């Protein structure tokens, strides 16, 4: 991914990789500038593992932290690469999510995205967007289009991006090569997700270009979580206005679902208050 970004001139965090399966690999931890972020390169393999100290993404504050994390993954039997990256400063609201749908030629036919208001802060799910405000950014749309066209990408792709206030750039972290839960904001913006798949893969119809940006907030958290844990006052007020006006959408809500599913969805939704208080503190704007 990063080699392609380098080739196309797409901004990305400075990145190093270390093979956990190679016994001869040694990390010169003192040579880095901290803080850093470390994460496994193969999430599919990593998700199947269970061991004490496991986290989805590791914050690395010191050389000792980096060596400890590398040894932890090795000893747990993780046999793929550890990705180490420059830490991009900024709160959750510096993050951007962009979803594309491309045809067989790699041309992006549908694009949607937004500004992350809050992400999950629990160790096992850190980084999963929990609230996204619709926002269109020309620069990241054009970068994503060039990437998809260059590799001939087909279908749904979800790009994780972060605004770097140090130089005004948008750094691309990765592409998730499948639709995820937050792909729901594509539907909120007016594009039918199922129809796109049917038209492209079954009916082989030409899909007209569409930018699916609506005026509905994607959210998996109650209003109280926003009140307590969004520190940016302007952003917080904008998001709360959308709650008050009813311009919100929760991906687990469906009037056709069974009572049991509706109950599960509502309990999961309300549980986020307790969960965010646990991992971010219970004080207002903690």
Predicted regions and their residues:
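Active-site nucleotide/adenylate-binding loops and adjacent lid/helix of ATP-dependent enzymes
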Residues: 1-83, 104-105
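Phosphate-binding site of ATP-dependent enzymes
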Residues: 20, 60-122, 135-145, 163, ...
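Flexible, glycine/charged-enriched surface loops at secondary-structure junctions
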Residues: 83, 154-158, 207-213
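Glycine-rich phosphate/pyrophosphate-binding beta-alpha loops
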Residues: 117-129, 176-190
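Conserved metal-phosphate-binding beta-hairpin within the catalytic cores
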Residues: 149-184
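Peripheral (often C-terminal) accessory segments that flank ATP-dependent C-N-forming ligase machineries
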Residues: 199-286
